């Protein structure tokens, strides 16, 4: 839902600025929330007011440009609110050490899961939005979200790196990691499962998603191995 907006936020804050402030969680949150347009209200709580003050200072210092959109909240589970995701991202940036090197050098995907084991700061245990208290719930990045990050970011990046540098070991590792991640569960994978093609891993579910977009949506059934098999079974 917020993919485009999050990309705008990422592009609006140079990575060197984030690196410069990575040891100060409040400053990281101020930069991310401020660029997302989430610090523009009049707050009564001390914490968002502190972030607001930090952001105004950092915004003037770095002359940051505001993004066009704002994160949406509609049709979202509270645990997936953009406020929670940005708070988790801030902690990840603070805790991460040489993440790209870990991707290249590690052979075990569990090392990546370990680095993605992040929990937002204490304020968010009692909030989903600024200024609105809620029952206590630890805002820990869930396994499903970690899977999604690995599937859609880490694995493609590692494979692309291997392709660019002609390093088959990176490409093989990317595919091996993809095969070790749980299959995604969505309308597309469930549809294939009903047709007799269950996804055993993220390797399968990504293949089904690609088939759906490239063949099913384009009505290229006769060019598709799965489509041809289904058509043969119907014609018998």
Question: What does each model-found stretch correspond to?
Answer:
Residues 1-205:
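Hydrophobic, aromatic-lined core segments that form the binding pocket/scaffold
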Residues 194-236:
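Acidic, carboxylate-rich catalytic segments that either coordinate divalent cations
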């Amino acid at each position: 839902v917020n993919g485009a907006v999050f990309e705008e936020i990422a592009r609006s804050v140079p990575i060197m600025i984030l690196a410069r402030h990575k040891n100060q969680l409040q400053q990281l949150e101020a930069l991310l929330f401020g660029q997302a347009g989430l610090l523009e209200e009049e707050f009564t709580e001390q914490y968002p007011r502190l972030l607001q003050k930090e952001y105004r200072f950092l915004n003037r210092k770095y002359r940051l440009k505001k993004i066009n959109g704002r994160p949406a909240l509609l049709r979202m589970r509270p645990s997936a609110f953009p406020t929670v995701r940005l708070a988790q991202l801030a902690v990840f940036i603070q805790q991460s050490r040489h993440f790209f090197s870990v991707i290249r050098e590690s052979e075990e995907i569990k090392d990546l899961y370990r680095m993605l084991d992040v929990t937002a700061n204490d304020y968010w245990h009692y909030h989903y939005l600024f200024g609105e208290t809620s029952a206590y719930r630890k805002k820990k990045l869930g396994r499903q979200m970690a899977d999604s990050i690995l599937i859609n970011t880490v694995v493609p990046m590692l494979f692309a790196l291997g392709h660019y540098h002609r390093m088959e070991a990176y490409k093989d590792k990317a595919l091996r990691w993809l095969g070790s991640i749980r299959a995604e569960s969505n309308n597309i994978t469930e549809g294939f499962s009903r047709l007799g093609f269950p996804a055993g891993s993220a390797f399968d579910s990504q293949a089904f998603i690609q088939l759906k977009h490239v063949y099913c949506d384009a009505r290229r059934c006769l060019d598709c191995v799965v489509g041809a098999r289904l058509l043969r079974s119907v014609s018998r």
